[in-house]
């Protein structure tokens, strides 16, 4: 049974590039007109994949060809969404996601490509608030220090036993933040003390939940520093990095720079560096599903060949994160959720509702995401 995917981000990018050559954007057209334009593009170029498969001699039942935006499949997507929502497996929440500043959308973990790049490890001096000295932290992203809300050390690190619970002064920002202890911190990395920026790192975000730390967003959707960045507001993240490093050095907070190679996450479509960002998204709870998948292999109902890959499979399944399914684009299956601004009711429906079942209001607003 042959078929093609609507490729939401990739297709929207191509059509937006066409519009850019005409000197307009999708926002100039509006959502409905833009989607019409995408369908026009699909009608013109969408058959290329099928024609290639036919030329390759693929033996398919071509009368059963499907496209993921066909009416039947669109109904199926809504059906699955509603069922999972009713079962408590789909929810909306503020969480840290992989944000592409170029595509202006969240993407899943599987849509992030990692490339090793040479960079630096900056060692920065954070003075103790009581004047008893300072603690050195190492970071590959000094620009994110604007959103620091703690410095963390390993609870088993003898070097910092008497420092846990103290406060330090965040350089350049002059904000007091605590020194906390967490098992996540690797004693061998840098000085053994790390800055915690919950709004810009998934691991820091998780640590903030464990220690009830404040989350301070420092960038907008374009990866430009926002008002929380003080004098750095309006600077893109890389310009801000240069200026932060310069100011740290001038004010005596920068104590060392070491060459450092690390993996940088990039958008799988446009290759822009991903910016971890806290935003409101729709998620699928995967832990209950992962438990069933693990049980299937343990019981022998599913076999992994070769069996040496079972350890990798179990590692992935036991350390899995909830799946972000919403995208801030226009081309795709729109989230089947409507909001009533009169009473606040959230309506999840297989069909487009014409009025609020709670208060009868006929003016409903559908979720913008796909």
Where are the regions that the model predicts?
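Protease-associated
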Residues: 134-137, 142-196, 202-206
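Residue patterns forming the tRNA-binding/recognition surfaces of aminoacyl-tRNA synthetases
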Residues: 12, 16-134, 189, 193-348, ...
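RNase H-like polynucleotidyl transferase catalytic core
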Residues: 1-2
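Glycine-rich (often Gly-Gly/Gly-Pro-rich) flexible segments and glycine-rich loop motifs
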Residues: 343-370
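Serine-centered coil/turn micro-motif
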Residues: 157-158, 267, 358
């Amino acid at each position: 049974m042959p078929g093609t995917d609507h490729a939401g981000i990739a297709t929207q990018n191509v059509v937006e590039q066409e519009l850019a050559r005409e000197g307009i954007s999708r926002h100039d057209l509006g959502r409905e007109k833009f989607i019409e334009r995408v369908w026009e593009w699909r009608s013109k170029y969408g058959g290329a994949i099928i024609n290639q498969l036919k030329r390759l001699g693929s033996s398919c039942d071509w009368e059963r060809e499907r496209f993921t935006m066909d009416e039947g499949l669109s109904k199926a997507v809504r059906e699955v969404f509603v069922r999972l929502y009713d079962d408590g497996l789909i929810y909306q929440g503020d969480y840290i996601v992989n944000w592409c500043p170029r595509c202006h959308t969240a993407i899943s973990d599987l849509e992030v490509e990692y490339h090793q790049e040479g960079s630096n490890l900056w060692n920065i001096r954070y003075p103790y608030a009581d004047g008893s000295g300072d603690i050195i932290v190492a970071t590959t992203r000094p620009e994110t220090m604007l959103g620091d809300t703690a410095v963390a050390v390993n609870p088993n690190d003898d070097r910092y036993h008497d420092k846990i619970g103290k406060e330090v002064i965040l350089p350049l920002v002059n904000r007091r933040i605590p020194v906390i202890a967490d098992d996540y911190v690797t004693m061998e990395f840098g000085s053994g003390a790390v800055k915690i920026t919950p709004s810009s790192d998934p691991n820091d975000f998780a640590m903030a939940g464990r220690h009830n730390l404040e989350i301070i967003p420092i960038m907008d959707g374009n990866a430009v520093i926002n008002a929380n960045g003080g004098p750095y507001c309006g600077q893109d993240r890389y310009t801000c990095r240069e200026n932060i490093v310069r100011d740290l050095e001038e004010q005596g907070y920068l104590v060392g720079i070491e060459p450092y190679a690390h993996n940088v996450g990039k958008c799988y479509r446009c290759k822009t560096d991903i910016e971890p960002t806290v935003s409101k998204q729709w998620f699928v709870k995967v832990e209950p599903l992962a438990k069933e998948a693990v049980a299937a292999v343990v019981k022998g109902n599913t076999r992994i060949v070769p069996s040496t890959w079972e350890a990798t499979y179990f590692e992935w399944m036991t350390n899995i994160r909830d799946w972000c399914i919403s995208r801030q684009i226009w081309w795709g299956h729109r989230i089947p959720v409507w909001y009533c601004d009169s009473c606040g009711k959230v309506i999840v429906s297989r069909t487009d509702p014409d009025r609020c079942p709670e208060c009868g209001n006929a003016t409903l607003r559908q979720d913008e995401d796909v």
